[in-house]
């Protein structure tokens, strides 16, 4: 066996050893007790938060006896061995096997009052921002302090969220890796077109017996929005908020759990909409199909460059029967972007809307009474129009993954991935592009 092959195995074993340092006795002490200091109506940050979507209105088991503060965290350390190639003449970044920068989140949960909680997440270290950076925060109301029969009855079914927060568009964002918080994601990376954004606004939910609806309104951009809006090609400089809707059903049918949801997001004009470019952490495929002369943070992902006039719809289906799980995503979106030259004159000239479609299908099987081991497969494809192209481009990805929960808080997972790029222009580094290989990731969440 060659020396470099031995060194790779040793380094991968070191990652495994750093996780398996937990004793066998500790690994079997899976406690179902309540978390000390946890808030009400929340999503746990460990394994028990998997397949939790919107919080429910079920009666809480911890009575409010005063302010409660809980500090949590998410931590990921990844080893990757990827190979990439292109038919373009653009030189590729020369990469080999090695460890990626660890990512970490600090999560602050505060129960402020009965039925009122605060969620604040800080990125301590990510691929894009290796310094501390606030992701966002919100206040969630599941009860109101008015103590009147009308509001008490209303809040049996209603939830209100207000803040600079991750918007609830689609179900896929509940299963994605978010910097150090990778315990919900059975795979090594998010979807190719990663719909995720933090915006300033509010959401109102109504739910009863597994049927729910939601409406949200935000400023339509990831940053503050006090700047004057640029005029478009028609001379209109009006600034619009983003409005989004979601409805679905989540019920147990016999021994199976079945969930179907539909979401729509509309943002006619904002300064800088980032529905498909709002992740400030970065992708998990470091250096993949990246040019030698540049260092990005979204390698392996695709954005259609919609910054204005965005209209998007996502449909999701989830079925769980015993250890078998199915999760599907269909998404279609259209929008346009500003022309850089005209933008300097205060005019946005690009009024030609482009369309993008995305499909993802994944299946998992979780083994054992506690479902501590799983195997998974996912196929993800994107077809999109781009400026200057007469035909749509295509990107497709096949992922095979497996994972092992040593405890509810510690996960070791690995993924083998093949991603191909089709119909890009010869001048584009993605022309005839492909990357493949494996990633191994240790995750801690609490």
Each model region followed by its residue ranges:
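Outer membrane beta-barrel
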Residues: 60-83, 94-223, 237-255, 259, ...
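Alpha-helix capping and helix-loop boundary segments enriched in small/acidic/polar residues
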Residues: 192, 234-235, 429-430
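Glycine-centered small-residue hotspots that permit tight backbone geometry or close packing
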Residues: 49, 73-75, 105, 282, ...
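Sequence/structural signature of outer-membrane beta-barrel proteins
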Residues: 78-87, 123-127, 146-148, 167-169, ...
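Short, flexible helix-coil linker/hinge segments at the edges of structured domains or between repeats
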Residues: 175-187, 223-232, 280-289
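Outer-membrane beta-barrel pore domains
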Residues: 26-35, 41-46, 93, 138-141, ...
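N-terminal periplasmic/intermembrane-space "pro-region" immediately following the signal or transit peptide
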Residues: 2-76, 149
């Amino acid at each position: 066996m060659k020396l470099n092959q031995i060194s790779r195995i040793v380094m991968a074993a070191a990652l495994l050893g750093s996780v398996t340092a937990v004793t066998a006795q500790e690994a079997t002490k899976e406690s179902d007790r309540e978390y000390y200091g946890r808030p009400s109506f929340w999503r746990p940050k460990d394994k028990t938060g998997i397949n939790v979507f919107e919080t429910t209105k079920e009666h809480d088991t911890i009575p409010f006896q005063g302010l409660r503060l809980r500090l949590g965290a998410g931590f990921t350390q990844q080893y990757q061995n990827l190979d990439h190639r292109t038919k373009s003449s653009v030189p590729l970044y020369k990469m080999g096997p090695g460890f990626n920068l660890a990512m970490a989140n600090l999560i602050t949960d505060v129960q402020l009052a009965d039925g009122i909680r605060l969620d604040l997440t800080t990125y301590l270290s990510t691929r894009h921002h290796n310094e501390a950076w606030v992701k966002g925060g919100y206040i969630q109301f599941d009860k109101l302090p008015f103590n009147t029969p009308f509001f008490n009855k209303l809040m049996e079914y209603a939830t209100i969220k207000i803040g600079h927060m991750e918007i609830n568009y689609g179900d896929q964002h509940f299963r994605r890796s978010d910097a150090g918080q990778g315990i919900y994601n059975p795979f090594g990376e998010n979807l190719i077109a990663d719909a995720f954004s933090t915006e300033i606004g509010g959401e109102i939910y109504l739910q009863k017996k597994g049927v729910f609806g939601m409406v949200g309104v935000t400023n339509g951009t990831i940053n503050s929005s006090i700047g004057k809006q640029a005029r478009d090609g028609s001379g209109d400089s009006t600034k619009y908020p983003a409005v989004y809707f979601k409805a679905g059903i989540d019920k147990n049918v016999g021994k199976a759990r079945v969930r179907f949801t539909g979401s729509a997001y509309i943002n006619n004009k904002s300064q800088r909409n980032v529905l498909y470019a709002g992740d400030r952490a970065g992708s998990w495929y470091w250096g993949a199909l990246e040019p030698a002369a540049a260092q990005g943070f979204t390698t392996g992902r695709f954005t259609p460059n919609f910054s204005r006039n965005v209209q998007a719809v996502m449909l999701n289906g989830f079925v769980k029967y015993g250890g078998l799980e199915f999760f599907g995503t269909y998404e279609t979106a259209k929008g346009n972007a500003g022309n850089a030259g005209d933008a300097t004159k205060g005019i946005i000239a690009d009024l030609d809307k482009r369309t993008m479609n995305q499909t993802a299908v994944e299946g998992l099987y979780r083994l054992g009474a506690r479902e501590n081991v799983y195997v998974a497969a996912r196929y993800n494809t994107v077809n999109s129009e781009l400026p200057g192209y007469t035909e749509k481009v295509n990107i497709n990805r096949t992922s095979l993954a497996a994972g092992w929960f040593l405890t509810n808080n510690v996960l070791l997972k690995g993924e083998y991935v093949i991603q191909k790029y089709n119909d890009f222009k010869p001048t584009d580094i993605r022309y005839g592009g492909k990357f493949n290989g494996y990633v191994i990731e240790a995750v801690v969440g609490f």
